[in-house]
């Protein structure tokens, strides 16, 4: 059985084949776990395809057990890109998959496959619903917060208000994907309710994600060994992840727990010491920096840098509290 995956990330093995190195230090690790599980089945051939700016033409790569098709990113996969359609037809004709699994509805290359090829053997899985979350993209910030933190990067790339508009546009082809789909995979009642509202005729399949093997080595969180009163955020580089809301709550937390600390996975979005950092500083990063200073939290916030699976696991084990605050998406926990 041939299964074609269409993903939003370049798998580490494919990156190694392209540029000689590769380690996943971003979201999407559950796909590696699921791929490893599928590869235990002898009757399954897995083909993984994505878009990347590391190639300029459609590239086929042979991994140890997985065949990869990497499409050139082109203009962007954040908006409708008709160039993907002919490439997907080429991939489909060469692979002739029995099943196509599109991981996520956030990007236009999955939408392009459904437009270019038959949807009869396609299942889409919900990772995040941009059509819903766009309304709350910078919830907790005012437009004045956006304008007074305008940066050079905002001039080139746009402010969070522009990003919200882009989310809304992406939400339109996301809804089109859901309307076309005959099968949808989700994890939460929110996934089910939102997709049913768009396409009540699609068959819904519940399926939790599989993590990478390192998360199943028997380690378990223990209060005795955690860093007391530490709060961990697994990502927070754009407003939807709610870092600004956690910072606003921190003065109240500090009244009761003066030694409380916030640790955030990922690069430091507030750094602006060098010219390069000043150029790359986003308006949201500037807003977070001002908020930290206003609330006198300079010694209470740490960015860890990008983490691999083992490093992420250690952060989960060390933290006293995990804050996975997110406004109106597939997850809402705090």
Each PLM stretch: what is its role?
Residues 1-55, 64-66:
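N-terminal subdomain of nucleotide-sugar transferases
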Residues 205, 275-306, 310:
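Nucleotide-activated donor-binding/catalytic signature segment of Leloir-type glycosyltransferases, i.e.
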